[in-house]
Curated annotation (Swiss-Prot):
The gene is NOP14. This is Probable nucleolar complex protein 14. It is found in: Nucleus, Nucleolus. It comes from Eremothecium gossypii (strain ATCC 10895 / CBS 109.51 / FGSC 9923 / NRRL Y-1056). GO terms for molecular function: snoRNA binding; U3 snoRNA binding. The keyword Ribosomal protein does not apply. Belongs to the NOP14 family. The keyword Nucleus applies.
Length: 806
């Protein structure tokens, strides 16, 4: 068994002669050790240290070990030493960077406002002006005693004084050597000529300064004299200015030659030239299209409109492309003159024509006869913005004249005539809607034909206005829907009016009811569903009201053919209530009735009766047999429309029509001469036979096979080859990418190490600073405590001495 780690270390050191007996008697013949022995000893000690500390050495394991490669070289690394070397390098770089901190020179841009994004041009100019004035102020303070300063105010603020009195200038022309030759006389001149040239004597500093001061005083005196002379001339000109101006005003003016007037022909020619310059260049006109081209364009437009309608019905139109209720183009009045949809032939009647609006199948209305001054009155018609204002305008006219007055108001306020007319007509469209509902809510049994004709004319006008004022009209309709819903929620059927049914009919006439979602039609459909389900059928008035609502609901769905559950529920209740049986017999149909007083008589005559229910039936106090017969025929017609239009393509058609078969059989047996129930049952049977109704089953899928792949083998396999791409260029690119990825990875690793080292050094510096501060404060506290202790001991000692003297 091998010994311990310590024993093996001792044995190894002793075997290499590093330990053991050292006082052995040296041989005289053996040479002494040299410096070489010390290096060899250090190498041996390092090898022994690595041998006994295997954790500092890392050997890479070969992944592809081949047989017979036992003596192969293995890559060996020393991560500990490498890490230590890296730490030492980072520490040296950190110390050098720290030593150069705040010492590196550089240019500082002191220009104000050059790169400031928050300062405007005016603020930058103001700041520059302020800096310039400050610099001038500092310069003026520095040049207060500058002898070379050119500015001199001539006051005593900068002059030399003695006891407050200015000293006289000791300047003389002789200081500059002027007239020196004349003072010395001709002898001096001759002497100078006879004298030999001598070396000029170097001036002393005092002489140079004296000469400089003299020159400065001379130049300053010259400038002062020139300034005084200029000021005198300016004062003289100012004094003589008034006299010169008075003489100039008194001088006669030279007469200018009058402009010769051009002949009339030249003036006309100049006028024509100016007009030609100002005229705009005419735009090229489109060529006249043939009948075939116009027909083809019309067909393409109709196809596009139908496709858009189908997309809206299926909810496939985006909000940007949909031309719904909320869309109102600001340039609508400037649109082209082509047909615009289903009612395009009427769109020019309001905005682009001065004639009256013309509708199909409308008789000519008479001119207003309420006033004598017709044209003036029409021209002065105001545009009402409320229904009360419209009633004030219409009070002066008869009932049949109201459509003509409304047309005149629309023509008088066309958007092309004045600014703001478009907004006025927007509001007027809502006012016209309220007026139509107002006419519908009044009892007009005495003049029913006139009111119906007026209503139809106003509805036609409203339809035309809806083509251009869709947004304003839709907002007014939504307000009406909200009002109806609030009244129905508060008072149920008692809160409803006959005009509400007219409103729902108008919505179906004006807006597209086949859209998947519509801002006006969708709330109306929800409200109609509430009427069909929640109104209790206790009398004929309510039954007629809901029957009309059901007919409107069927017309809403005539294109989209969506299923309305409330409609089927109402038809079952209504037909069961009208059965000519007693309550006990009606209970056999499993239908709960609201009243048993609505049963019809078996003696009713139902042949040749129109299925239309008129709105004036709601104002009747008694309902005779004719009204009851029309009610029954109307309900059966509504059921027939549901069967043949709405429910025909529904997969649950047998389930929907099953509850109606007993009811229809009962009506057929009660009224044998009335063929409508039997026709509806036959239609139900035909549609049921054509439909194939299968129960729901799970979808049967073919089992998917488990994929199997053959392994891929390389014919020319080489473990040293990393890519088998035959394209040399692509291979080089991939190699470059791999190398770049590797270098980037190593660089990021080094950056992370540097960041961590910087963080450790920062924490170490903060800790060192905190320790120094703590030691400093402790030293100060100890010093203060020592001084206080010494003072305290001294005080105690003096106190004891005073006590001992007593």
């Amino acid at each position: 068994m091998a010994g311990s780690q310590l024993k093996r270390l001792r044995a190894t050191l002793k075997a290499h002669g590093l330990t053991g007996q050292t006082n052995v008697k040296k041989s005289k013949n053996r040479k002494t050790s040299k410096e070489y022995d010390h290096e060899e000893k250090a190498r041996v000690v390092s090898a022994i240290r690595e041998q006994f500390n295997p954790f500092d050495v890392k050997a890479n394991r070969s992944k592809l070990h081949a047989a017979g490669a036992g003596d192969a070289k293995v890559a060996v690394g020393k991560p500990g030493i490498s890490k230590q070397i890296g730490e030492e390098q980072r520490l040296r770089f950190h110390e050098s960077k720290k030593a150069q901190k705040n010492r590196a020179g550089g240019l500082i841009d002191k220009r104000f406002g050059e790169r400031n994004k928050h300062m405007t041009a005016e603020e930058i100019m103001l700041e520059r002006f302020t800096k310039e004035r400050q610099a001038q102020s500092r310069q003026s303070k520095k040049s207060l005693f500058n002898l070379d300063d050119e500015e001199d105010d001539g006051d005593a603020s900068g002059a030399l004084t003695h006891f407050g009195k200015p000293l006289a200038s000791d300047f003389e022309d002789g200081d500059l050597g002027v007239g020196m030759a004349g003072a010395l006389g001709p002898k001096r001149g001759l002497a100078d000529d006879e004298m030999e040239p001598e070396v000029p004597k170097k001036k002393t500093k005092a002489e140079v300064m004296k000469e400089v001061i003299a020159k400065s005083k001379f130049y300053k005196h010259e400038r002062q004299k020139a300034r005084e002379q200029m000021e005198e001339e300016i004062d003289q000109l100012d004094d003589e200015f008034e006299g010169i101006m008075s003489e100039l005003r008194a001088a006669p003016r030279a007469r200018t030659n009058p402009v010769e007037s051009k002949p009339s022909q030249e003036l006309e020619y100049d006028q024509k030239v100016r007009e030609l310059c100002l005229d705009r260049r005419a735009a090229p006109a489109d060529r006249v299209k043939t009948d075939e081209e116009m027909k083809q364009e019309r067909e393409e437009k109709l196809k596009k409109l139908e496709l858009d309608r189908v997309n809206r019905m299926n909810g496939l139109v985006d909000g940007e492309d949909a031309q719904g209720v909320e869309d109102l183009d600001n340039g609508f009045w400037e649109a082209e003159d082509s047909d615009a949809g289903e009612y395009g032939e009427y769109m020019e009647a309001i905005a682009d024509s001065d004639d009256d609006l013309k509708f199909e199948n409308e008789p000519e209305t008479a001119e207003p006869t309420g006033t004598s001054h017709k044209q003036k009155k029409i021209a002065a018609l105001p545009c009402p913005i409320t229904h009360a204002e419209l009633m004030d305008v219409l009070t002066a006219y008869q009932l049949e004249e109201q459509p003509h007055v409304v047309k005149n108001i629309i023509k008088a306020y066309q958007p092309k005539l004045a600014e703001g007319n478009k907004e006025k007509l927007d509001k007027f469209s809502g006012v016209l809607l309220h007026h139509i509902l107002f006419l519908s809510s009044s009892d007009y049994a005495s003049q029913a034909d006139v009111i119906v004709e007026v209503q139809n004319s106003l509805i036609s006008i409203l339809k035309l206005m809806s083509e251009k004022y869709n947004q304003a009209l839709s907002e007014a309709c939504r307000q009406v829907v909200t009002e109806i819903q609030q009244r129905f929620k508060a008072q149920h059927y008692l809160g409803l009016k006959p005009s509400d049914l007219v409103f729902f009919s108008l919505v179906g006439y004006i807006f597209s009811t086949s859209d998947h979602y519509h801002l006006v039609v969708t709330p109306c459909c929800i409200l109609l569903g509430e009427f069909l389900e929640q109104i209790k059928l206790t009398d004929y008035e309510r039954l007629i009201f809901v029957a009309i609502a059901a007919n409107i609901c069927v017309r809403y769905q005539r294109i989209s053919r969506r299923h309305v559950p409330e409609l089927a529920y109402f038809l079952k209740r209504a037909l069961a209530s009208l059965l000519p049986f007693s309550t006990e017999n009606s209970q056999a149909f499993n239908i709960r009735l609201d009243s048993d007083k609505l049963s019809l008589s078996k003696t009713l005559v139902l042949e040749d009766i129109e299925p239309t229910l008129k709105l004036r039936f709601l104002f009747l106090k008694e309902y005779d047999d004719s009204v009851q017969a029309q009610l029954l025929v109307n309900l059966l017609s509504t059921l027939d429309a549901c069967v043949s239009q709405l429910w025909k393509g529904v997969s649950a058609f047998p389930e929907l029509t099953q509850p109606f078969k007993p009811l229809l059989s009962a009506f057929a047996s009660s009224y044998p001469t009335f063929a409508k129930p039997q026709q509806i049952m036959e239609r139900m049977e035909r549609i049921s036979n054509l439909q194939q109704h299968f129960p729901l089953t799970l979808q049967n899928h073919k089992p998917a096979a488990i994929p199997s792949y053959m392994p891929k083998f390389e014919d020319n396999f080489n473990p040293e080859k990393k890519s088998y791409d035959p394209d040399r260029t692509r291979n080089d690119i991939n190699k470059m990418k791999a190398q770049l990825k590797k270098e980037r990875k190593l660089t990021m690793k080094e950056l992370r190490k540097d960041t961590k080292f910087e963080a450790r050094q920062k924490i170490e510096e903060q800790r060192k600073h905190a320790d120094d501060y703590k030691a400093k404060m402790a030293r100060i506290v100890n010093q203060i405590s020592t001084e206080e202790g010494a003072d305290k001991n001294k005080y105690e000692k003096e106190k004891r001495l005073r006590a001992g003297k007593r």
